[in-house]
């Protein structure tokens, strides 16, 4: 996977009762792993490693142990933390000097077989032989990293063995290079009369990646700001350069870069460090000697004057104004990221400059009305050896490029003169406090990503993690010098000659030109071939296809057994109280580390149909337009000072027992430090009772940003949009999902953003408020420590009494409403005490599914495809069989057909909670052929040509998802949102265990390929003459 983006924050944080609730005592979190790690002594020798440093990091509840390998110099960092989701990663500094994508192709190819595990594609096979909670590999601009995580010690050893052998002793077979990188092959490999074309997984992945104009801009920005070494090239590979890469170059790059002397090992969690060190030393490092490295990235020579560049990109067919599609940014080179305090300071400074409506650049650029949103890669980017800061606008007219540049310069001058308000600095420091306290389910992955760039350039990763000391030093600098930040702005922005202005505008013939250049490259390659070369290519193509079609013996790979899966799941204690009379509130006591997580769900049942399409917009702007006596700037300031964020999102929640029944509503979510709970709940009261809908100009700004974000997201999430569209006519909930989140919503927002007079839309917001922001059909939930629960009860009670109810009873718009209580009592939900939550579901007894085939013609060189089938709801025993079948079809058929043979970046099958079975592909050079592969996959499933071993592997893969760790903030959410008790989930678990060969073939025949009315199809991608001629397709 190619990764290209700026460094994110440490732990991105997006996000009196009738029956008195009885809270249970919660055992304090054990610090056993941290205490154990503190016993290590500096200089101690352990399995070929020497301990160099042992440092407690109390703010993150961990102990850091730094080691080095005696023979090879390999670096090692272990973060001991009482977290059972343990993680390993190995990282290599990879510094390509051309755009052939050699580190990216190598990342793919090393995972295709190794000395100890010579079977083809052990990486994908291990996805089905493990209970991993994460497995992947990523290529960044200057490093390649291979992480995995699991909660099972035996699984950790298995995966570690496979990862070590793959990275240090890969086979690197030529056929694997052909498959994963690039190859010349006949369009139909079995017919030498068909034309030769370029194929390959990475080749197609990068063609897809560069359909994203934001990515094109970000890539050029880095290449042109840092032009003198490795950052001047495309590490993932330029599709026009990838065909220059040879197999020999690939092997040479591995020999020079994938060596322990150039490696950084990282482990995290509560497993014993000694076991990791022993295995890594014995299976890999003991077989190497130290190698002098030559991979260091030199400092970029600084310019003596600013530079300007202009580039082109593809047209955006969903842009709100065709005359305003230009992007411009001004970027500044900053110091080395290994100066951790300077990097910390500049990262904070970047947030002060660009984050939220109170920031100087938001006021100067976003609110100027010149564009739709900030330019890509805005803010501080710490992924390269020297960081950079970038700011600008997208969606502007070409004539306004100079104006934007002048606004940037003027804003810098104003900041130097006026500085920042104390409240804004405090709000930012408060955000960091929340980020260090909030616990994610994949904290190890967050940490390895956070330290990767700094450590890659020999910075101190432990220093980077010591947020507390960085904050103390930052406060000290501010106290000693009130102009500390202004001087940084003057130093790094005003007086910095290493400054780049980059502008980009669409060219209607951009993709045509790209295709032409690819055609010329192809002709050049083909014309240089002798008849013997062509014959060899034909034979190699047949050989590759034979290899891909051959049954693979994976017996050499380690594997867990189904018996290694825990037979039962841990149950979560929940208490349901009634507040303000009869409003259910779910209390879930958890070790939340001093944080409180509040959620409220409000029904949309009474909302008139004409308002439904703009519910997502209402949700998006509700917390951004002001409330009560606060204008939108003051509201943003209070949200930042008192909470970790307040979000509002539309939700369509399918019923667990009826396909045509669902719950519709809006989820309000927020989090805060315990001390700020009264302030957070007061903010919610003001948002519910007194939201402001008068700020027309700011509303326009928010509409344009929302429309731009939706348009920009299509190239990254095209398969999700295709699946939503394909399921639109299969269930009533699918239709509403498409309205809220699919291409229908993208089109709605495009239309609204194009309106010259936006008042008619603004006037609809108070109407939605009237139906939604009341207690009529609401339920709430709180996740907090047991000690905090009495205070939380009191605050939620006050909130609900303040919000009140509608003055008159409103009837549901859709007449068929079913009241469904959540399970309770010893038989239904023994771990839930107190009252019940009663959900009001919409049902449509007259609904008839029908087939719809839609092709969204977009200017992309690749396709995103979804085929959906209506099956059964969650509680039906067949759902578990279909869940296993989806994984089985992905691993044993679709992966080979769509990725290996077809060259798509991804593809497979999945089953949603709502009973929609989806076949999909991602960044796919094919369309009709892929739909045919979907049909063959169904035939394969019906034939039952799979073994008990295949079924067991599919179960392991499904359980790795079912048992993935849940953060304390999210415990009990399945019960709160979907009405699923732990007993119901345990019953489903037992159904998964009980799936067998007969059940799998039975559900294949029963649901897949049985009739058009239960099928939907959608494709996002380029024009297609075959589809255009087929009247059964709707062309958009």
Curated annotation (Swiss-Prot):
GO molecular function, one term: metalloendopeptidase activity
Location of this chain's protein in the cell: Mitochondrion matrix
Cofactor(s) needed for function: Zn(2+)
Pfam family, one: Peptidase_M16_C
PTM note: A disulfide bond locks the enzyme in the closed conformation preventing substrate entry into the catalytic chamber.
CC per GO annotation: mitochondrial matrix; mitochondrion
Disulfide pairings: 119-556
Assigned keywords, A-Z: Acetylation, Disulfide bond, Hydrolase, Metal-binding, Metalloprotease, Mitochondrion, Protease, Transit peptide, Zinc
Region span, Disordered: 806-833
Cofactor binding: number and manner: Binds 1 zinc ion per subunit.
PANTHER family linked to this entry: PRESEQUENCE PROTEASE, PRESEQUENCE PROTEASE, MITOCHONDRIAL
Role, per record: Metalloendopeptidase of the mitochondrial matrix that functions in peptide cleavage and degradation rather than in protein processing. Has an ATP-independent activity. Specifically cleaves peptides in the range of 5 to 65 residues. Shows a preference for cleavage after small polar residues and before basic residues, but without any positional preference. Degrades the transit peptides of mitochondrial proteins after their cleavage. Also degrades other unstructured peptides.
Name of the protein this chain belongs to: Presequence protease, mitochondrial
Lineage per the UniProt record: Eukaryota, Metazoa, Chordata, Craniata, Vertebrata
Gene name of this polypeptide: Pitrm1
